[in-house]
Amino acid sequence: AMAELGDPDGAMEYYEKSIKADSSYAPAYYNKGVLLDKKLEHDESLKVLDEAIEKDPKKPNPRFYKGIVLGKMGKHELALNCFESVHRANPQHLDSLFHKGIELAELERHEKAIEVFDKILDKHKGNINVVYAKARSKAAINEVNEAFDLLKVAIKHSKTIKLWARKEKVFEKFYDDPEFQRMVK
């Protein structure tokens, strides 16, 4: 909570004291790992998250967050492995499934990513982030009509998507397309 209240140094000190008091307390390692990531200390974050995983391997959060950090570092195959591991152990953990799809897309395995996004949308049709992610993968494999249909749905529910689409590398090839311009205007 201290980190969210603008005192990351106080939070770090608290986590370190917690670890010193009880070196087996996995949540302190997890929270410290998350905070290190927020401070852009990714390598150190991974080390601490690995300690959290070692202390309590059944908890999904440290492994999930390790996947997030690895993805930020461009280590998409390793990130994918983390998300697959979390999802196998916790099939109801939809965030791990979503991020599995994101990493598949980053690895340009768009057909597989679309399968993952469809699996989520079967259960949660209105998840706009998933709709947008699917639109990105459809655009990447040049299924333009489907990509635009999905993008329209996403934009209808969240104007922020317009901003994302304008900056999204996968949509660059459509910048001169009048329909795309209308959607993101």
State the predicted function of each range.
Residues K156, T160-K185:
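Terminal, low-structured helical/coil segments at or just beyond the last alpha-helical repeat
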Residues A21, K55, A89, K123-H124, ...:
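Structural marker of alpha-solenoid helical repeat scaffolds
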Residues L5-K17, K38-E51, K72-S85, L107-K119, ...:
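Structural signature of tandem alpha-helical TPR/SEL1-like repeats
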Residues N31, Y65, H99, A133, ...:
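Canonical tetratricopeptide repeat
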Residues A139, V144-I161:
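TPR/TPR-like (Sel1-like) alpha-helical repeat modules
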Residues F64, I68-K72, L94-E111, E115-K123:
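Alpha-helical adaptor scaffolds
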Residues P27, N61, D95, N129, ...:
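Start-of-helix register in tetratricopeptide repeats
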